[in-house]
Amino acid sequence: MPDAFVCASDYVACILMQLLEKRGLRVPEDVAVSGFDNNIEDLLAENLTTVQVFNEELGSRLALQILYRIKYPHTPHEVTYLESKVLYRASTGD
């Protein structure tokens, strides 16, 4: 069993935490779990360490890139970095 899981979404992380609990494992005592997207719709998610992505900024940047790519289809691809924030909560311990 790994020491930690980093999940692609908070939804997946919450399901994983439920499955771990059914197998008798404790989060974070036995295994740490982290999500991604800070989508708190589940009661388990309020204790979930996650990475918050600023969706408005992401959407704006994506729209600009699509429009640019339509206008200039042969330009090289670029790497875009966007701000995010780790929200440390109980699922990864102290």
Residue ranges and their predicted role:
Residues 1-94:
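Flexible loop/turn connectors
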